[in-house]
A protein has these predicted regions:
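Short, surface-exposed binding/anchoring microloops in extracellular/periplasmic proteins
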Residues: 44-46, 53-68
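A short, N-terminal "cap"/entry segment at the start of jelly-roll beta-barrel domains
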Residues: 2-52, 82-84, 89-111, 115, ...
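Glycine- and acidic-residue-biased ligand/ion/polar-headgroup-sensing regions
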Residues: 66-86
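Active-site scaffold segments
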Residues: 71-74, 102, 124-125
Length: 146
């Protein structure tokens, strides 16, 4: 199944205040943008970056910034919660092999975190396209394909 990110409604969406630690982390990310959209960079070449997200039940990937066009595919089914830059908190149920695409125009970006609120390991593969409207952000030192 291929669905645009904006075409799939969340299972739950709230606009309530975030916990203080989450809000503080979001503020830090706004001052020091985090380009690491996965837990591990698997591959990088002149055209793409390929990431994996692997989160045990209860684990969380901190705030990160999408500036490139990308897609992700859920390898395992799970439930996730994300705090999104518009101040909302959303929850989704992910099915194995579910794929979604994100496209960002010049100067646009998306910031969010991701927490596995399911009972099983959450695994996604993310592919970013470097020939997008925005230039790729530099990766932190020490982040290299594994």
């Amino acid at each position: 199944m291929t669905v645009s990110m904006v075409d799939r409604p969340a299972d739950k969406k709230e606009a309530s205040p975030w916990p203080a630690d989450i809000a503080a982390e979001f503020e830090r990310e706004s001052k020091h943008p985090n380009p690491c959209v996965g837990t591990t960079l698997l591959s990088e070449n002149e055209r793409t970056r390929v990431w994996i997200i692997r989160l045990a039940s209860g684990e969380r990937l901190g705030f990160h910034r999408h500036v490139l066009d990308y897609f992700w595919t859920a390898i395992s089914g799970s439930r996730g919660r994300a705090h999104v830059q518009d101040g909302t908190t959303v929850e989704y149920t992910y099915q194995p092999n579910e794929t979604r695409h994100g496209r960002l125009g010049k100067g646009e970006f998306t910031v969010h975190d991701l927490e596995n609120i399911g009972d099983h390991e959450m695994v996604f593969v993310i592919v970013e396209f470097k020939d997008s409207a925005n230039k790729p952000m530099a990766l932190p030192s020490g982040v290299a394909p594994q």
